[in-house]
């Protein structure tokens, strides 16, 4: 047998060693990728499992270091735990939110949006009821509500005007009564002063007892004259107001009669013109026929 040279043996050994090393490296890389995939699945599914690789699942070949592999997987496990916790918290909060939304009575529409756009929330049954007359549409309701408000505002405005006019009438009546009372008091004072002056001259020579007895009936007469004068002034003011009203009504009637008479005269003139025009045309036609 021929001997194999030493160089060729060394080359073969190097090739075998490199092949084995590459296989081991590829296998470790594949296991790393698989563990990362499992971590992602566990993070999204919320399952917990041990991430440290067991010694039985590893190939014990040349160049494999279990301690380095354990050191490599420690931070990965810590990161996966934090991710799982965050994912579980987010999932629980999402579940609570979904349950709250499912139990909401106004889930598919907002109340303010319903008020602004009620037509979009109407169903077929509501539309049928509206067409049959059982139900009123929201637009009709709003229009009726607005009309009622308008009517109420008109009524309140009329009531306010009536109250104001009534107050003005009361004020004018009070002013008239005050003026008449002042004038009657002034007139009574003047009459009383003149009466006392006249009564002093003939009674100078009489006794004091006579003067005292005469003072009381004089005051009583003055009060009676004042009351009678005030009554006369009030009655005279009421009579004056009635006379003014009657005068106004008479004037209005006269104006209406004059207007109607003028209108009747104009109508008669127009009719006369028309008849005269017809008569003139008839006469002209008769004259033309005679000439022929």
Curated annotation (Swiss-Prot):
Residues 47-67, 122-292 are annotated as: Disordered. GO terms for molecular function: identical protein binding. The keyword Ubl conjugation applies. There is a cross-link at residues 8, 76 (Glycyl lysine isopeptide (Lys-Gly) (interchain with G-Cter in SUMO2)). It comes from the Eukaryota. Pfam families: NKAP (PF15692). InterPro entries: Nkap_D1 (IPR043407). Residues 280-292 have a biased composition (Basic and acidic residues). Coiled coil: none annotated. Residues 128-140, 180-194 have a biased composition (Polar residues). Keywords: Isopeptide bond, Phosphoprotein, Ubl conjugation. Residues 147-173, 197-215, 247-259 have a biased composition (Basic residues). This is Uncharacterized protein NKAPD1.
